């Protein structure tokens, strides 16, 4: 999960992160958990997101399910013929989230993950 609306010490909903100027992203989110560790995205990492409501199959995206207050980071797989969307973690300890038919209305893609920044020192 990603804490989408975490407030900083001033009570603001935004903060600043030092990042490479070559990263073309609209916002970043801090990762909480290990569901994407197979993609080397670890707890505490910053994920840079480019806003877009659709992403290519196999892309990693930040997704909100059921208007939750947190976003989840998953690999997106969509079968347009069957109208099935699979949100796939990169950790076998977690299950796929599968949506079809009217359930697809529960999904809001915030954007595509375009870069990751680890806090490993």
Where are the model-predicted features located?
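Flexible, small-/acidic-enriched active-site or ligand-binding loops
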Residues: 89-98
């Amino acid at each position: 999960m990603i804490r989408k609306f975490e407030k900083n010490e001033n009570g603001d909903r935004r903060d600043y992160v030092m990042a490479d100027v070559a990263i073309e992203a609209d916002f970043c989110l801090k990762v909480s958990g290990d569901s994407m560790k197979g993609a080397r995205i670890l707890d505490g990492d910053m994920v840079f997101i480019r806003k877009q409501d659709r992403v290519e199959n196999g892309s990693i995206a930040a997704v909100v399910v059921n208007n939750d207050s947190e976003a989840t980071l998953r690999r997106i797989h969509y079968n347009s013929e069957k109208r099935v969307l699979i949100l796939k973690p990169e950790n076998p300890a977690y299950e796929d989230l599968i949506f079809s038919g009217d359930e697809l209305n529960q999904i809001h893609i915030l954007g595509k993950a375009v870069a990751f920044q680890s806090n490993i020192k």
